[in-house]
Amino acid sequence: YKRQHNEDAARKLAQTVQFYFTNKKIIYIMGVLRDKEYEKIAEIMSPFADSIITVTTPGNPRALSALTLAETVAKYHNRVTAADSLEEAVEMSYLLADKDSVILAFGSLSYLGQIMDIIDKMKTKRA
């Protein structure tokens, strides 16, 4: 999980993805604030994903809606879905993934802790 919210950070994250996850199926969970460079982030990051799930960052009045983000991402990627909640995004990512897949959540730092909590709860349920 990385905090990536601008063009330069997106380029660095793209390099990291290319270096560490070559030949892996990559699924993104992406949520951003509307005052960030989300179009550029989508353009830079989209080529490395197999699927992209967009989310609305909860509890932040500056959050870009998952639907608006999905419409933007769709300019650069043909497998994008807007999730109704973080829980749905995590569930969808698990359904799309296989054992060797990489699920990468990035964008607004404010929702990443919540994603981790959801994953922990899912692991507990599945154990």
Regions found by a protein language model. Name each.
Residues I26-Y28, S101-G107:
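Generic beta-sheet signal
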Residues K2, I52, A105-S108:
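Residue-level signal for inorganic ion chemistry
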Residues R3-S51:
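Nucleotide phosphate-binding/pyrophosphate-handling subdomain across enzymes
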Residues S108-A127:
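Glycine/aspartate-rich loop-and-adjacent alpha/beta segment that forms the canonical ThDP
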Residues V17, F21, V73, A97, ...:
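Active-site catalytic pocket residues across diverse enzymes, especially alpha/beta-hydrolases
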Residues A42-V102:
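C-terminal helical cap/extension that packs against the catalytic core
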Residues H5, L33-D35, P58-G59, L109-Y111:
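Short glycine-rich anion-binding loops that position phosphate/pyrophosphate groups of nucleotides
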Residues R11, E39, E91, G113-Q114:
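Alpha-helical elements of the RecA-like P-loop NTPase motor core of helicases
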